[in-house]
Amino acid sequence: MKTKRLLTLLLAVVLMLGICACGIGNGEESASVEARKAEYQPGSYVTLGTYPQTESGNDSTPIEWLVLESDGKTALLISRYALDCQPYSTECISITWEKCTLRSWLNNEFYNRAFSAKEKERILVSDVSADKNPAYDRRNPGNATKDSVFLLSVAEANKYFASDEARMCAVTDSAIEQVVYYMDDDIDDDTVAEIENDYEVDGRIAWAWWLRTPGDRSSSAARV
């Protein structure tokens, strides 16, 4: 039987170029750049990449991203919906974001499936801090990393989402199927009902999602 540790949905976060500053001239090119800047305002939604989001998992639906922060040249994005369900670590051992299998999965399987070669050119490799959890400050956060795709920290989740309600994340139908898979192949009707009767955001079921900060156990991470 798999443990509940495996059930939490990941939420991918990407720091990417909002505009390309190379070869910018006047006239129409400058107007295009200004339009791109206006598009990437904090609180707005943009699309980048594709990922399965229907129950069948056979689709390639455009991924919607919420703009968390933008300086006119780069923008920090978080996926509007939880796109998949993965364990933080495939082994129950003391682990940090630096070494966890979820980080590897995000920057390999997810990254390569979600983005085209052209889209990858716009995604920056980010310096990702290793922060302690203020509630469990004895937990080792590991070392800082460089990632194309990563998760928010506890501090960042509190910074960009001011309330518990704002931090609730809706789940795609495909991700719900992954939740069921990780729970048990023989999941019963009562458990399915529990999932379906959970909180809702944007008319969709909301579920817990991973942060990269250490959690209450050395083998896992914090979650929302």
Question: What is the role of each PLM region?
Answer:
Residues 1-33:
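Gram-positive cell-envelope targeting signals
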Residues 29-224:
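Collagenous Gly-X-Y triple-helix signature in extracellular proteins
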